[in-house]
């Protein structure tokens, strides 16, 4: 697992030891960032269910203005801090329950939602993003889930 491009290009990120996580593969991450590459610079990023922090770190490396990393696991939060320091990047790291964080945070231009599979957290997080109006106008939400999962329905003006 590495940073694909930007100021931290090529830096290897520490992976979890014994944590119940499945970091996004470099190939998937590269494809995802190729799709949004012109929508990153200067943006405010939220990496919810951060795990290793690799999605927010990739965004910072590519010029995002700021990033907030949220995870309830103490080990994950420490791993995000370690990876940020290793990449010489700065971000706000929050240890806490993701859905609770969404009730009190400000707006973001780019939101990464990569919760544990088969927990129902993706649908709940999307509902909270809509309910609490967290996505800035023109913003993007990137969700990761099983391929077989049916895409959630969102009210206007949101679309998938």
Regions found by a protein language model. Give the residues of each.
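Class I S-adenosyl-L-methionine-dependent methyltransferase catalytic core
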Residues: 1-160
């Amino acid at each position: 697992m590495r940073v694909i491009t930007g100021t931290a290009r090529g830096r290897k990120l520490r992976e979890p030891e014994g944590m119940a996580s499945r970091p996004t593969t470099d190939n998937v991450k590269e494809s995802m960032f190729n799709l949004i590459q012109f929508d990153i610079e200067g943006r405010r990023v939220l990496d919810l269910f951060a795990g290793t922090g690799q999605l927010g770190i990739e965004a910072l490396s590519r010029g995002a203005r700021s990033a907030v990393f949220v995870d309830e696991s103490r080990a994950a939060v420490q791993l995000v801090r370690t990876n940020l320091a290793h990449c010489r990047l700065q971000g706000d790291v929050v240890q806490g329950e993701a859905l609770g964080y969404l009730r009190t945070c400000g707006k973001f231009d780019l939101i990464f939602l990569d919760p544990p599979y088969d927990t129902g957290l993706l649908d709940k997080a999307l509902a909270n993003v809509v309910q609490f109006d967290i996505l800035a106008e023109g913003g993007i939400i990137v969700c990761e889930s099983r391929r077989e999962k049916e895409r959630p329905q969102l009210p206007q003006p949101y679309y998938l």
